UniProtKB/Swiss-Prot annotation:
Subunit structure comment from the entry: Interacts (via C-terminus) with host IRF3; this interaction leads to IRF3 degradation. Interacts with host IRF7; this interaction leads to IRF7 degradation. Interacts with host CUL1 and CUL3.
Region called Interaction with host IRF3, residue ranges: 267-393
GO biological process, one term: symbiont-mediated suppression of host cytoplasmic pattern recognition receptor signaling pathway via inhibition of IRF3 activity
UniProt family annotation: Belongs to the rotavirus NSP1 family.
Region (Important for cytoskeleton localization): 80-170
Region span, Zinc-binding domain: 39-77
Family annotation (InterPro entries): Rotavirus_NSP1
Any GO molecular function: metal ion binding
Cell compartment(s), UniProt: Host cytoplasm, Host cytoskeleton
Top-rank taxon: Viruses
Biological source species: Rotavirus C (strain RVC/Pig/United States/Cowden/1980)
Keywords: Host cytoplasm, Host cytoskeleton, Host-virus interaction, Inhibition of host innate immune response by virus, Inhibition of host IRF3 by virus, Inhibition of host IRF7 by virus, Inhibition of host RLR pathway by virus, Interferon antiviral system evasion, Metal-binding, RNA-binding, Viral immunoevasion
Protein name: Non-structural protein 1
Swiss-Prot/TrEMBL domain comment: The integrity of the zinc-binding domain in NSP1 is important for degradation of host IRF3.
Amino acid sequence: MANSYREMLYWFGKTIDRNLPYVNTNGWRKQKGRKDGICLNCLDECKLYSCDHCGIKHKCGNCVLSECFLDVKNEFNKYRWLVFDEEPDQAVLLQHWIMYKDYFLQKFNYRLATQAKILNMNKNQKFQLNEGRKRALSVPITSQFLKFRLFGKIYIQFGTIMTNKIQPWLELSTLKIGYLQLLNVERCSELMATRGQFTTNVAKTACITEIKCRRPIYDNDCIIEAYLDKNDRGWKFAAILGRRKIPVTQKLAMEYFMKSLRAELFYYAHSRCHTLSNCPRWNEGLRLLNSSTLNIVFRRQFMNEIVEWFEIFSQYTGSHYEFITECVHDKSAITAFKQEIEDYIKEGKQITLKSVVPEEHAAYRHILRLRESLMLAIDAALSRIRSQSMGVL
């Protein structure tokens, strides 16, 4: 069975416009042979074939006639495939994603006769639609994107990536999967599903920020479900572990917040270690990155600003060191840094960063901005935790 994004493309082309986005609309051919990556047109894991336009293997057997991402002409692909000369910021990406989302919902309209069947859950509990169409109709409009550098340009592709096999022809250090927001709340608000038997509101994401290490990436790293509660008549969010739905309370959220902070401190401390060093960050047996689903849900819900802060902080401090192959973890400095953060959370004591950025450090000129931005990021996370009046994320 194809993933929901590919099924969406199939029904998009079959019921709306056969040239949009120009894939095989006579039924998907059954994939045979070894799967070695994802097709950049349908984003499904499959055996890849060479593109007639560029010669790169980036198309599956069902999409051999589709456009090449290096030569975009049709309207749909212009919205979902972007190219930039320089690294785009989040504001630019958000503007493009809004245009992509608006165009998608205008064309793949859930109010049309075919799509509307999914909304009539109360009158049609048996829901007699074939599985492929159900998957197509349930595709989430996530703000997930695939980003890579090729021929000196930055390529952004919006879509739902649900596999750990990305592209064999790309250097992994140039590849990133990112998110502009967590859930497709706008579309969820239109759905009238009152029972969880058909999970139209599931956003399944591999939760990868950047692939630079040897950590195995698991297909089911993160599953998040938004659902309407019949009793409270409001939205609730839960992490899915097997068949269990796990709501996250305020108390647990605070525990995960402290745990996540400690993890960020750990990875900052080892941010300049080489993959071949004896640093525990690269030790397969430790598997610190193989976090629980609940931890990943929390990280995405509350930790975005703090994670971004540590990424920038690592760049500021790491860019002023020679590239080395030894572990540079400084236990005393990180312990002092950790204590500063805990004192700020518990007592409101200002963070100085003196333990990790001494005055002679080249990054010290950014010290005021770094201090203020870290405290603001922590404040934002704490305010979200304390505002959970429903008791769940």
